[in-house]
A protein has these predicted regions:
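Basic, polyanion-binding surface patches
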Residues: 1-164
Length: 164
């Protein structure tokens, strides 16, 4: 069987709806680092593990590979501009953006749908990405509507008409 070309694969993957997160850490100069991702997923409840992946060409890769901690902010539907900002090639994504710090000092955003503070547990080679697994050391959630991403666009969840 032939492998699909990257354009077809990308189009097929865009059919899968995901949540939108900003993953953050602190670099070795004490500066906050963050990026938008939709590769976030749960791995295990016992122990509590989550994963996300990062392109090997990312300027943030070294900081995430070297860190002991990272945080994940699951964005709410009100945070589409924040998602776009942290996905853009901006030099200082945190400039003018309000955020708090987790107990380990990782940047976290207010008004998220949920958040996870993690210790960096494992890293795996995943083709053109590195897969990061984190052990959740604290988390929280709100009642806000989560931001979704599908077909190359942001969206919000809506009940299916048959169950609404």
């Amino acid at each position: 069987m032939e492998q699909p070309n990257s354009e077809l694969l990308r189009k097929a993957l865009r059919q899968f709806s995901t949540g939108v997160v900003i993953v953050t850490t602190i670099n070795d100069h004490g500066e906050p680092i963050g990026l938008t991702a939709n590769s976030f997923n749960s791995v295990s409840l016992t122990p509590p593990l989550v994963l996300w992946s990062l392109n090997k060409k990312s300027k943030s890769l070294n900081a995430f590979q070297a860190t002991k901690y990272f945080a994940i902010s699951v964005l709410s539907s009100e945070q589409m501009n924040l998602a776009a900002r942290f996905a853009a090639p901006i030099e200082n994504r945190f400039e003018g953006v309000e955020f708090n710090h987790s107990s380990s000092g990782m940047p976290l955003f207010d008004n998220c749908s949920s958040w996870f503070e993690c210790t960096s547990s494992s890293q795996y080679d995943g083709g053109d990405h590195i897969i990061f697994v984190g052990q959740v050391i604290s988390c929280g959630c709100s009642d806000s509507i989560p931001l979704l991403y599908a077909r190359g666009a942001y969206g919000i969840p809506a009940p299916h008409p048959e169950v609404a």
